[in-house]
C-alpha cells in the first residue's frame, strides 16, 4: 500500500515482544493453491450493495479463521498459507469489494467500516458465529474495524505487517498511473509491489499480478484513500485497547513500507504478543508462509 499526505495511492494483560527465529527451508517462495479435497469451496455472495467472492477450505466444523487481504491485492495472496492452516481451521477468505473476483461498482462506499460491515454480513450468510480474524497490511485495518463493529463475532485478531498509524509509514516513490490507460502493465504493477518484499528478486506470483489488473482505477485509488482516512481518525492500538480481544502482531523486520519499530506501538493493547520476523519484509504470508502459519497456529491454539 502506498501512502502519501493525500492518502494511499499509486499516484493520482502483560505484553510481550520477541524476535521470532529465522528459518530457511528453501520453500519460502512456494505458492501452492489449495487443493480440492472435498473441503474446498468457492462461491459468490450477493449482498445488497455488491457481490463478494468467497473461498472456504478445511473442515466446516473446525474453528473459523478469516483471512483478510490488503490493498491492491486479493484473497489469492493467502494461497500459500491455506494448506498449512486448513488442517486445523475452517479457513475463510473474502475478496473485499473492489478487489479480486468481487464486484467493483463505482457507486458504492469503500470506506473501511463499510468494507468491514460487508465482511460481517458475508460471515452471517455462511453461518459463522465466531471467528479468529487475521489481516495482512491494510487487511488488518479492516479486521480492526470488524472487531469494532461486531465484537461478538470476532474472538481474536492477528495483524500481519499492519502499520499502527500513519506516522509509521515509510514514504514511497509515487507511481503515476493514467486512468485513460487502464489497466496497468505487469511492469507497473511489479514496480508498485517491489517494496512489499525484503528481497528485490522475489518472484511475485503471476496470479496476484493478474488479480490487481482486475481492479478498476476508481476502486484501487478509493480503497487506498479510505484506509488512510480510517488511520487518520484514530490509531489502531487506540481502537484495539478497549476491545478486550486477544491480539497477535507479526511484523517483518525488514518491512520497507511501515517502520518495523512501530510494532511496539501495539504494546498498549492489554495481553498483546508482538513477533518481529527477521529476514522478512512487508509480506511474510508470501515470503515465508511456513513460519508465518506456524506462529498464527500457535496463537489460535493457545487461545482455545
PLM regions with names:
Residues 16-35:
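Long, intrinsically disordered low-complexity tandem-repeat segments
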Residues 36-51:
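N-terminal cap/lid segment of alpha/beta-hydrolase-fold proteins
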Residues 50-101:
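Conserved HGGG/HGGXW glycine-rich cap/lid loop of the alpha/beta-hydrolase fold
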Residues 83, 247-280, 286, 291:
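Conserved loop-alpha-helix segment in the C-terminal half of the alpha/beta-hydrolase fold
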Residues 144-149, 155-185:
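Flexible "cap/lid" loop of the alpha/beta hydrolase fold
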Residues 168-170, 185-242:
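Conserved alpha/beta-hydrolase catalytic His-Asp/Glu region
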Amino acid at each position: 500500500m502506498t501512502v502519501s499526505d493525500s492518502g494511499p495511492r499509486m499516484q493520482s494483560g502483560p505484553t510481550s515482544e520477541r524476535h521470532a527465529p529465522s528459518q530457511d527451508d528453501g520453500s519460502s517462495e512456494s505458492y501452492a493453491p489449495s487443493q480440492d479435497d472435498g473441503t474446498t469451496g468457492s462461491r459468490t455472495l450477493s449482498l445488497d450493495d455488491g457481490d463478494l467472492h468467497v473461498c472456504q477450505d478445511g473442515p466446516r466444523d473446525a474453528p473459523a479463521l478469516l483471512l483478510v487481504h490488503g490493498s491492491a491485492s486479493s484473497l489469492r495472496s493467502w494461497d500459500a498459507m491455506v494448506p498449512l492452516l486448513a488442517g486445523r481451521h475452517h479457513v475463510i477468505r473474502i475478496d473485499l469489494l473492489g478487489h479480486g473476483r468481487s464486484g467493483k461498482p463505482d457507486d458504492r462506499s469503500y470506506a473501511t467500516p463499510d468494507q468491514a460491515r460487508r465482511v460481517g454480513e458475508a460471515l452471517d450468510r455462511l453461518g459463522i458465529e465466531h471467528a479468529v480474524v487475521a489481516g495482512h497490511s491494510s487487511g488488518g485495518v479492516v479486521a480492526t474495524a470488524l472487531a469494532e463493529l461486531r465484537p461478538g463475532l470476532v474472538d481474536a485478531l492477528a495483524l500481519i505487517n499492519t502499520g499502527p498509524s500513519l506516522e509509521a509509514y515509510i514514504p514511497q516513490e509515487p507511481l503515476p498511473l493514467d486512468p485513460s490507460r487502464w489497466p496497468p502493465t505487469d511492469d507497473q504493477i511489479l514496480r508498485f509491489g517491489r517494496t512489499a518484499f525484503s528481497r528485490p528478486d522475489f518472484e511475485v506470483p503471476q496470479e496476484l499480478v493478474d488479480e490487481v489488473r482486475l481492479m478498476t482505477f476508481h476502486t484501487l485509488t478509493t480503497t487506498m484513500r479510505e484506509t488512510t482516512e480510517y488511520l487518520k481518525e484514530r490509531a489502531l492500538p487506540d481502537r484495539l485497547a478497549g476491545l478486550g480481544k486477544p491480539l497477535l502482531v507479526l511484523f517483518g523486520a525488514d518491512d520497507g513500507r511501515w517502520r518495523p519499530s512501530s510494532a511496539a506501538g501495539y504494546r498498549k493493547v492489554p495481553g498483546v504478543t508482538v513477533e518481529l520476523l527477521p529476514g522478512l519484509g512487508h509480506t511474510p504470508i508470501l515470503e515465508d508462509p511456513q513460519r508465518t502459519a506456524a506462529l498464527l497456529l500457535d496463537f489460535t491454539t493457545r487461545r482455545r
